[in-house]
């Protein structure tokens, strides 16, 4: 599956999911020979997917592993090296774990965060699609 297809699927899922509620940029300390000019945005999207996966599950969205599945598609499309796959997964886990430390129950701020991340993730995916046609 091409990057554009994977990003389109992520964008559609982020836009169509029922909303409830800024992300840190992934670290770029590693030298990856497969690095792409859009990596900062891609790793940010990965982190958002992890955050959304955790928060929506916490708030009872009953989506199972949908967001993890979207991440698997992204890794399958963009994980062209072991280092790159590890960085993508690390970004997803960073989003998941970061919000797992902050939110233990579904609260109004958690719902607001979901809304923000759904919007931010959809915009980011759309931007990645547009810039990489």
Regions found by a protein language model. Give the residues of each.
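Bacterial N-terminal signal peptides that target proteins for export
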Residues: 1-6
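Cleavable N-terminal signal peptides
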Residues: 8-9, 19
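N-terminal secretory signal peptides
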Residues: 19-73, 122-133
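Compact alpha-helical subdomains of small soluble proteins
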Residues: 63-133
